[in-house]
Amino acid sequence: MFKKLFGQLQRIGKALMLPVAILPAAGILLAFGNAMHNEQLVEIAPWLKNDIIVMISSVMEAAGQVVFDNLPLLFAVGTALGLAGGDGVAALAALVGYLIMNATMGKVLHITIDDIFSYAKGAKELSQAAKEPAHALVLGIPTLQTGVFGGIIMGALAAWCYNKFYNITLPPFLGFFAGKRFVPIVTSVVAIATGVLLSFAWPPIQDGLNSLSNFLLNKNLTLTTFIFGIIERSLIPFGLHHIFYSPFWFEFGSYTNHAGELVRGDQRIWMAQLKDGVPFTAGAFTTGKYPFMMFGLPAAAFAIYKNARPERKKVVGGLMLSAGLTAFLTGITEPLEFSFLFVAPVLYGIHVLLAGTSFLVMHLLGVKIGMTFSGGFIDYILYGLLNWDRSHALLVIPVGIVYAIVYYFLFDFAIRKFKLKTPGREDEETEIRNSSVAKLPFDVLDAMGGKENIKHLDACITRLRVEVVDKSKVDVAGIKALGASGVLEVGNNMQAIFGPKSDQIKHDMAKIMSGEITKPSETTVTEEMSDEPVHVEALGTTDIYAPGIGQIIPLSEVPDQVFAGKMMGDGVGFIPEKGEIVAPFDGTVKTIFPTKHAIGLESESGVEVLIHIGIDTVKLNGEGFESLINVDEKVTQGQPLMKVNLAYLKAHAPSIVTPMIITNLENKELVIEDVQDADPGKLIMTVK
């Protein structure tokens, strides 16, 4: 029972990430728009009073605020998309269902505009009226105030309708409404029933939520923040933290803004107070992340590096630097946390307790900083320093330094005292399977027991989430050998921690299971015998030339942590100046990705090179690329492989920087030439 529930909660937690992922963009617009007419900033920069600047700042602020004002709708659509595998029909059904559900509740309970705005008749303008907290005006519909819970409920129901009826067949005369077209229709019926049910069920639930909110926030908020911090971090390994913090961020607490509108939830209240220019009272459930994410965990990473064996320090140092910097800048801590969670749980226990105290200390000091993504330096600048006079954000720095010291010495002591096997202190090297980029999803699928053993497949920012039919068929050791930093098992639910490449692995696995991608050709053990003698060329030195005209940069400067952190192998970055990618050596085309954004080559001496054209170009679905070669085709150095529309890539991709990665460097030495300007005849690397 628990294991099945855990699997369902996993899916819901993943689904909630989609609407939450929209908030950073909205938060940036709101923060910058508000900052541009901040009184202190205007005094320093009087040019901000310019009418055009004022208009721009007002537009930015309004554009950001409208997202926070309509979070329930976004949660309805996002939850449906997440639980229905990303199908747009489910999103449309959720949108229709959400509107119908609210309209139904309004009609059943006879809710009017006057019921929503208690003092509307006496106010000069409707926007100045005080809003009645039990009711809401949702996209112009007077209805019950169900908040994000209402959106999540309708999104989940729309996804259920999609999964149940997307392939339904109807009689020929109703054939037009069969299949996916039937989903919004049946969702509408479900929405009416849900609206009627909630009309009577939601008011007592609403009273209960308000009572719980008042108890948590008014009885002992200091203790509540401490417990919140502990539980939120404790749920990270299970991927259920999104479910836990959502009520605190989006429902608990209330504030009436200057427009007379009731705003609920710690994060939403903070954003409303940012816009209103009033002292912050919200932020108790966000501020505590900044000290341990920006200072504590990077210090823990240094302690892990310091205790690594001398021969492992270089490798561990690179991993810890990358993970620590990611935590500091963005607040994405999973790559670092999972590096010690499975091998040294005692360290994670220490981390959880310190995270709880961080929330407590920030609350006691009166520091109130909002966030939209996570507690990294970027959010600290936007929501802390830009409003330092109201947020008291400067206190984060001395507190963070103290946490860095505490984290470092506690981790250092625990590692040495208990002889913990943190990265770099393992008894022996774990065998890592040589799985090229093209083969990795195939190998992971095999390790999971094959496609017949996959019941549900999903992924989030850092982990591959799989529900399997038979857990005994899963090769956990094999998954770790393929590069997973850990594997969490709860019943038949598996979470493999592959870091930022998890989503791409999931994407490729889904295509493999549907037959869209076939396995790269391999030499089998039982090859057809030939009368001709087989010539086996000895492995030797391989010269690798530039793949076109452009600039060569160090791999560390590639704007992607997976490549820059050498998670896929070593190499260089190439910035193309002409729209043609050529072969860097004589060899064979082993892989052309379906989206044409990456090519896998093998030299005559067996060196495998991946040319990944641009960053995040997989999302372009092949637009801007024209392949000039085929898989298994022999190519010569300088032969054109791909035509690239650089103008299109610059407009639609984060970067045109093209990583060139050697994916099988085991027992080989890579020599990188000191080259900046490149052309197809210039040597840039040698593998010995």
Curated annotation (Swiss-Prot):
Keywords: Cell membrane, Kinase, Membrane, Phosphotransferase system, Sugar transport, Transferase, Transmembrane, Transmembrane helix, Transport. The EIIC domain forms the PTS system translocation channel and contains the specific substrate-binding site. The EIIB domain is phosphorylated by phospho-EIIA on a cysteinyl or histidyl residue, depending on the transported sugar. Then, it transfers the phosphoryl group to the sugar substrate concomitantly with the sugar uptake processed by the EIIC domain. Residues 438-519 form the PTS EIIB type-1 domain. Its main location: membrane. GO terms for biological process: D-glucose transmembrane transport; phosphoenolpyruvate-dependent sugar phosphotransferase system. Disulfide bonds: none annotated. GO terms for molecular function: D-glucose transmembrane transporter activity; kinase activity; protein-N(PI)-phosphohistidine-sugar phosphotransferase activity; protein-phosphocysteine-sugar phosphotransferase activity. The phosphoenolpyruvate-dependent sugar phosphotransferase system (sugar PTS), a major carbohydrate active -transport system, catalyzes the phosphorylation of incoming sugar substrates concomitantly with their translocation across the cell membrane. This system is involved in alpha- and beta-glucoside transport. It is found in: Cell membrane. The active site is at residues 460, 612. It comes from Staphylococcus aureus (strain NCTC 8325 / PS 47). Residues 3-427 form the PTS EIIC type-1 domain. GO terms for cellular component: plasma membrane. This is PTS system glucoside-specific EIICBA component. The chain crosses the membrane at residues 12-32, 81-101, 137-157, 182-202, 223-243, 284-304, 315-335, 340-360, 364-384, 395-415. It is a multi-pass membrane protein. The lineage of its organism: Bacteria, Bacillati, Bacillota, Bacilli, Bacillales. Its EC number is 2.7.1.-. Residues 560-664 form the PTS EIIA type-1 domain.
